[in-house]
Amino acid sequence: EAIEAAKTDFYRLGWVADYPDAENFLNLFHSKYVPAELTTKTYINSFRYKSKIFDQYFDDAVQTVDETKRNELYTKADQQVIDDAVVMPIYYDIDFRLLQPNVRNCPQNAMEQRDFTEVYFVPMKGF
């Protein structure tokens, strides 16, 4: 609540995407989510970051159908956030995968969501 009400100077925040697209993360930095009054709570852009340059890259990316061009624009938007030092990334999740040749039906996806009910192992030769 203190974060949403801009009553803290420093805090840790985590975000997990619910769909695999850069928009899901970069949307957090769009100035359209910054309220006019500092006392008004905001959930999405709790950083209260405003950048016309970022917004333009982001808005253009959202409107772009070409995936390569869209990713280029998202990269520029991301770099703008980095250049403006809006956040300080200090922690990244570590994800695990089962990649042994005897593992079967182990799902791999960018969202790190897995259903292991169909996973099985086949005997390895020589063991």
Predicted regions mapped to residue ranges:
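A broadly tuned preference for mixed-charge, low-complexity surface segments
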Residues: D9-F25, A61-E67, F116-V122
